[in-house]
Amino acid sequence: ADPKNYTFTHPFQIGAIRLNKEEIEFEDANKGDKPTMELLVANTSDKLYTPVLMHLPPYLSAVATPEKLGRGRTGKIKITLDTDKLPKLGLTTASVYLSRFPGDKVGEENEIPVSAILLPDFSHISQQERLNPPAIHLSAKELQMGELKSDEKKAHTIIVKNVGKSNLEILDLQVFNSALGVQLKKRVLKPGASTKLKITAFGQNLKKVKGTPRVLMITNDPNNPKIIIKVKVTSKK
């Protein structure tokens, strides 16, 4: 097979190895679950290749099939997330590294970012709580910040309101990468109360970022336990 065939099916290249994804994401994991995902691998080198992910965190396991790929061959790595081993609610991030050849070192070229989002467990809430839940409302879920020079920063404010019937708790607030910073005035909102969420984009960190900068919020609103705010911002050449 001509290696060029894989540019469409496996668009991401790490050395002579091509992959179908550049990051490993487990979007909505519930405690106790063991979700899996597959990373498709193509060997465009002229040597036999053994797909290995290095530096796996304790909550991930990986199995490659077949264990060895001949030249021009494809296979897959099945990755399993053990949610019981995640350290906390909300977002956990790490980096794993694809071994390109035996004895390969870890570095930026073969880094694959990992993210897992563990949702709160609502199975134990009472009937009373179920009938009178908090309800989060945001003034915006997507921010347009345009272009930023490397020495610039820009901030936007979102109003967070509890339009529900019991206290709203922001259990976790995190950014997916270093291009953003967040500040939240209040973590607990009584029914009818609101607060300000300030999101700042930093031009100097934008160049290093893969994907869309995002903010993650985990709440005790059973209908909106996870909220992702996307920030459209690019680095000015």
Model regions and ranges:
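Long, low-complexity ectodomains and other extracytoplasmic segments of secretory-pathway proteins
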Residues: 1-45, 102-159, 163-164, 222-237
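Beta-strand-rich interaction surfaces with strong enrichment in secreted/lumenal proteins
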Residues: 27, 64-69, 83-84, 146, ...
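Beta-strand-connecting loops/turns
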Residues: 32, 72, 89-90, 151, ...
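Surface-exposed binding patches on compact interaction domains or structured appendages
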Residues: 45-74, 165-194
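Short, hydrophobic beta-strand segments
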Residues: 77-85, 197-205
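Short glycine/proline/serine/threonine-rich loop/turn segments at secondary-structure transition edges
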Residues: 85-93, 205-212
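Beta-strand-rich extracellular modules
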Residues: 99-103, 202, 218-222
